[in-house]
């Protein structure tokens, strides 16, 4: 049995949710209603995120990237955690509902690109269009956009020990099929609502400590 780690990006690897930061800085006021409808699950993640980015003019591309480079912070302990999983031959994937134009630059030098799965953006028109290269498979009908549970099924074997690390509603479907969940923020609420066992965390030092214990117990 091997351990597979599937980790969210926004609000998990980074301290802040970069999509929400973009919306607060660059989107018109109507973005707030769309965000609330996503969190209440009135809108699917795919529908809601598409609507949010359709509110952002493409001519802000360079300004948005510069803003994120200046404001995004990598969560404490992440660098050491990546070193730990690499040293222990643990498979690590970033499965992010974030966008290629900021996920790749912020993880450059930390995670190989082939281990990162995120959404794609098109800046060729007046407003940003989101493309969805990792849709739901036949076992998921939640219109996730980037379907984390489908990616877990694609990238791993059913006999693997699946660990999901996340913070929000976008991680819920993945958490439902994980053997171990590390949760913070809104994902804690959703895990409790859905009776999903989880371990809370604030830094990746917390995750690493628990993973060391798992290595001793599970392997």
Curated annotation (Swiss-Prot):
* An annotated Gene Ontology molecular function: 2-hydroxy-3-keto-5-methylthiopentenyl-1-phosphate phosphatase activity
Record-linked InterPro entries: HAD-like_hydrolase_phosphatase, HAD-like_sf, HAD-SF_hydro_IB_MtnX, HAD_hydro_PyrdxlP_Pase-like, HAD_sf
Pathway given in the UniProt record = Amino-acid biosynthesis; L-methionine biosynthesis via salvage pathway; L-methionine from S-methyl-5-thio-alpha-D-ribose 1-phosphate: step 4/6
Report which reactions are catalysed by this protein.
2-hydroxy-5-methylsulfanyl-3-oxopent-1-enyl phosphate + H2O = 1,2-dihydroxy-5-(methylsulfanyl)pent-1-en-3-one + phosphate
Q: Which UniProt keywords apply?
A: Amino-acid biosynthesis, Hydrolase, Methionine biosynthesis
Biological process terms in GO annotation:
L-methionine salvage from methylthioadenosine
Q: What is its EC number?
A: 3.1.3.87
**Family stated for the protein in its record:** Belongs to the HAD-like hydrolase superfamily. MtnX family.
What HAMAP family does UniProt report for this protein, alphabetically? Salvage_MtnX
Q: What does this protein do?
A: Dephosphorylates 2-hydroxy-3-keto-5-methylthiopentenyl-1-phosphate (HK-MTPenyl-1-P) yielding 1,2-dihydroxy-3-keto-5-methylthiopentene (DHK-MTPene).
The protein's name: 2-hydroxy-3-keto-5-methylthiopentenyl-1-phosphate phosphatase
Write down the species.
Answer: Bacillus cereus (strain ZK / E33L)
């Amino acid at each position: 049995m091997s351990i597979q780690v599937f980790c969210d990006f926004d609000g998990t690897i980074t301290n802040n949710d970069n999509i929400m930061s973009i919306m607060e800085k660059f989107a018109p006021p109507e973005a707030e209603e769309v965000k609330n409808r996503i969190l209440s699950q009135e809108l699917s993640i795919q529908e809601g995120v598409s609507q949010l980015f359709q509110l952002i003019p493409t001519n802000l591309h360079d300004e948005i990237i510069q803003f994120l480079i200046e404001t995004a912070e990598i969560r404490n302990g992440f660098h050491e955690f990546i070193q730990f999983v690499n040293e222990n031959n643990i498979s690590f994937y970033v499965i992010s509902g974030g966008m290629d134009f900021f996920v790749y630059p912020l993880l450059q030098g930390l995670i190989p690109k082939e281990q990162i799965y995120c959404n794609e953006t098109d800046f060729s028109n007046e407003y940003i269009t989101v493309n969805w290269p990792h849709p739901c498979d036949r076992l998921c009908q939640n219109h996730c956009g980037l379907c984390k549970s489908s990616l877990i099924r694609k990238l791993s074997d059913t006999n693997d020990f699946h660990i999901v690390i996340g913070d929000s509603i976008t991680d819920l479907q993945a958490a439902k099929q994980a053997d171990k969940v590390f949760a913070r923020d809104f994902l804690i609420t959703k895990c409790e609502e859905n009776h999903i066992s989880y371990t809370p965390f604030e830094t990746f030092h917390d995750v690493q400590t628990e993973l060391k214990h798992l290595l001793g117990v599970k392997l």
